[in-house]
């Protein structure tokens, strides 16, 4: 039945089309009731189905909307990042354009700061009074500082002190403490301002020095090299000159008199000359005795001249500490070791300036009451007799400079000069006269007794000794070493054919055979012992037997003698003989006599017409 044909509920029929007034049978009534119940169930199911369909549709829509929102949010974030990056690039490009479009900046040297916060600046060759940018703290500006100027000549930035320029030598600091007299190129003198760091160094007390620490400032003193801007008229910093610092070695040597063998008499002489005046000044004043100003140690090479000079400084420091009641372990003295040949300089006046600086340094140290030893090694190389120069006459000005320092108007208190040379005959006589180098001590070659003393310094009880040698003296190490030394010295000083070294012929026709003992030295003895120790080490590696043997020492003597065979073969045997300590009649012929080697034939060498290099 169609919808139009179905009776309406409002026209007296029920939902199933039956009129309530129509009489029904019991069967029809039961069927009608059954249909009504089924319709009610279907109506409920229909309502439930409609609600389920609507709910599912709404959840699906929500998920779709959420997914779309997430996608839009991601796109939005990506666009934000892109915009931010583009903005940063635009800002960087704008800054780069602004930077490239800026006018050039100038630089100047700050001369002074005024009360109205303006500043005087030296720039472009002119002195100008300029204003400062508001972000510049004028109280923090320092004289001599580099400042940056903009196009309007306004100070916009404070920099560091200038680090390049000309080198000038400080002559003196003026009374105001802010200016100094310096000597520049070609001895041109000028007055310059001192930058604030140099003013602070100039104000340090006299005893203040940087020797106690690398980070501490050092007092500014005449002779220092300064970095100077001659146009601005400012000195910025002290520049240490390496060539001067290297020539002077300030140290307290650790060598004592006990380390020196075979020179007892010479040590006594130098102790009397150096230590007594320092330790007993009252007695010297009481007897009106003037202490010596200098000592000359002369003699052949390798005999201990430099060693004695070091021991003097060490002993003097300890004795002075005992007199003052100080701890001997903290004894202090200064040993200024001057390397003679390196003192020479090709520029006129530089050598003399170095000598002045050396003695100035010595006086500064001595003013504290500390003994100062100024040691000139190879003294003949720089203070030779005036007028004897072959290629130059530098000694004509260097020698007077030393004389004026030793015996000039300005005295030397607590300073003693020690010179060492193996050609004392070449040193200018004015230096050697009394009143300058008063004491002259000859360091001779060691004799047999001295050689035993020297050997005992190197052959000690701590050394490993071979069991076979120890067994000969019942295991007594001291007796074994003593016997080893005696045998070695007897072999070294024996006048046998194996020890013959040279046959020399003098100008008067006399001939003389010289043995190796005539050319022995402490350095040669040390070399012999070192060779023996090396042989003992090789024996351990080869045979496994440990310990030093007497045979090692005897073999070392033979090797040492053999190595010296060709040393006398020089172009000037007379000069070689003088250096070696053989003086007297002029030598014209030399013949080597080393056994086991091919002896050279007799050679006539004229020492007057054939001058050349010597050993």
Curated annotation (Swiss-Prot):
InterPro entries: AAA+_ATPase (IPR003593), AAA_ATPase_domain (IPR050168), ATPase_AAA_core (IPR003959), ATPase_AAA_CS (IPR003960), NA-bd_OB-fold (IPR012340), P-loop_NTPase (IPR027417), Prot_ATP_ID_OB_2nd (IPR032501), Prot_ATP_ID_OB_N (IPR041626). Residues 614-615 are annotated as: Docks into pockets in the proteasome alpha-ring. SMART domains: AAA (SM00382). Keywords: ATP-binding, Chaperone, Coiled coil, Nucleotide-binding, Proteasome. ATP binds at residues 302-307. GO terms for molecular function: ATP binding; ATP hydrolysis activity. Pathway: Protein degradation; proteasomal Pup-dependent pathway. Residues 1-36 are annotated as: Disordered. GO terms for biological process: modification-dependent protein catabolic process; proteasomal protein catabolic process. GO terms for cellular component: proteasome complex. Pfam families: AAA (PF00004), Prot_ATP_ID_OB_C (PF16450), Prot_ATP_ID_OB_N (PF17758). Residues 25-102 form a coiled coil. Belongs to the AAA ATPase family. ATPase which is responsible for recognizing, binding, unfolding and translocation of pupylated proteins into the bacterial 20S proteasome core particle. May be essential for opening the gate of the 20S proteasome via an interaction with its C-terminus, thereby allowing substrate entry and access to the site of proteolysis. Thus, the C-termini of the proteasomal ATPase may function like a 'key in a lock' to induce gate opening and therefore regulate proteolysis. PANTHER family: AAA-FAMILY ATPASE, PROTEASOME-ASSOCIATED ATPASE. Consists of three main regions, an N-terminal coiled-coil domain that binds to protein Pup and functions as a docking station, an interdomain involved in ARC hexamerization, and a C-terminal ATPase domain of the AAA type. HAMAP family: ARC_ATPase. Homohexamer. Assembles into a hexameric ring structure that caps the 20S proteasome core. Strongly interacts with the prokaryotic ubiquitin-like protein Pup through a hydrophobic interface; the interacting region of ARC lies in its N-terminal coiled-coil domain. There is one Pup binding site per ARC hexamer ring. Upon ATP-binding, the C-terminus of ARC interacts with the alpha-rings of the proteasome core, possibly by binding to the intersubunit pockets. NCBIfam families: pup_AAA. This is Proteasome-associated ATPase. It comes from Mycolicibacterium gilvum (strain PYR-GCK) (Mycobacterium gilvum (strain PYR-GCK)).
